[in-house]
C-alpha cells in the first residue's frame, strides 16, 4: 500500500512523468472524493468506485477522459501494490503541487472495492445532478445551480470560506464542465485570478440567453470579454460571498489563498478516510 512517505514520493514521480495534465489529475480526484455525503457518510474516494459502474459512466465525470486517467492509475497501482483509491487522491495532490509549488499533505489508507461489492442501483442516487465546483448542471433541473452548490458544500462539510476558495481555485486551474468561468491566462498555475477578475468593474454582466450563463462586455467598447455561470457570479452578487472574494482578491492574500485552498482540498479528499 501507498503508506510511507518514501513510497508516495516514488508514486508522485511516476504521476509527474505520466503525461497526464494538471486538469485531468485534479478533476479525477475531485470526481472521486466529492461524491461524499456527510448526511449518511456514503460516497467519497475510499473504494475507488469511480472506476466502476455506475460512476464511471456519469456525465459529470467526463467518461472518456476518466478512462484515460484510470488506465494510467491502474498501471501504477498494479506495479506498486498501492490501492487505486490512494493513487487517485495522490494524483490530484500532484496536480495541485505542480500548479502551486506547495506540497499538499497526503494520508494513505484507502482500499479498492470490486464491482461485486457495489450495488449499482443504490449508487445511482449519488450521481451529481449539479456540481458548481466543476460548473456542471444538468439541463432540465429547475433548481438554480448556485443553490445546488450550497447543498453540495454542506454535504461535503465545507464552510463558506472553504467553498469559496475551492471554487475559485478550480476555476483558476481551468476546471469547468461548461468552460464558463475560465478567466485565467495560465490554467496550469493555481492563483487568485478568478477573484480579482470577478471584482473587475470595467465590464457589465448580462444574460446570454442560454439560461444559467452570462457574458461580460466592456463598458466602453461593448466588446465581449468573458463568460461565466450563475454559480460563478453569485460570488460577486451575494454580499457575504463577495466579502470573502475581496479577501482572496487582495494583492497580499496569494499565500493565504494557496494555503486555504490546500487545506480545503485535503478536507474533501479525506472526508471518508476513517482511520481512528
Predicted regions and their residues:
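Long, well-ordered alpha/beta core segments of mature domains
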Residues: 1, 8-276
Amino acid at each position: 500500500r501507498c503508506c510511507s512517505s518514501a513510497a508516495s514520493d516514488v508514486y508522485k514521480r511516476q504521476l509527474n512523468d505520466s503525461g497526464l495534465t494538471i486538469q485531468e489529475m485534479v478533476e479525477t480526484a475531485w470526481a472521486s472524493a466529492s461524491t461524499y455525503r456527510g448526511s449518511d457518510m456514503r460516497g467519497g474516494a475510499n473504494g475507488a468506485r469511480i472506476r466502476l459502474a455506475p460512476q464511471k459512466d456519469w456525465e459529470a465525470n467526463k467518461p472518456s477522459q476518466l478512462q484515460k486517467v484510470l488506465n494510467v492509475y491502474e498501471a501504477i497501482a498494479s506495479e506498486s501494490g498501492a490501492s487505486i483509491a490512494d493513487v487517485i487522491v495522490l494524483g490530484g495532490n500532484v496536480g495541485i503541487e505542480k500548479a502551486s509549488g506547495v506540497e499538499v499533505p497526503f494520508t494513505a489508507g484507502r482500499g479498492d472495492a470490486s464491482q461485486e461489492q457495489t450495488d449499482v442501483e443504490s449508487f445511482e442516487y449519488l450521481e451529481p445532478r449539479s456540481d458548481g465546483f466543476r460548473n456542471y448542471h444538468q439541463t432540465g433541473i429547475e433548481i438554480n445551480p448556485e443553490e445546488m452548490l450550497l447543498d453540495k458544500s454542506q454535504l461535503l462539510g465545507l464552510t463558506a470560506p472553504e467553498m469559496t476558495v475551492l471554487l475559485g481555485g478550480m476555476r483558476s486551474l481551468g476546471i469547468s464542465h461548461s468552460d464558463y468561468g475560465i478567466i485565467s491566462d495560465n490554467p496550469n498555475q493555481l492563483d487568485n485570478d478568478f477573484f480579482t477578475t470577478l471584482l473587475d468593474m470595467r465590464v457589465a454582466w448580462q444574460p446570454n440567453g442560454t439560461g444559467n450563463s452570462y457574458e461580460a462586455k466592456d463598458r466602453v467598447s461593448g466588446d465581449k470579454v468573458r463568460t461565466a455561470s450563475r454559480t460563478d457570479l453569485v460570488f460577486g452578487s451575494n454580499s457575504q460571498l463577495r466579502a470573502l472574494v475581496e479577501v482572496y482578491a487582495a494583492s497580499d492574500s496569494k499565500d493565504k489563498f494557496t494555503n486555504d485552498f490546500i487545506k480545503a482540498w485535503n478536507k474533501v479528499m479525506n472526508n471518508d478516510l476513517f482511520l481512528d
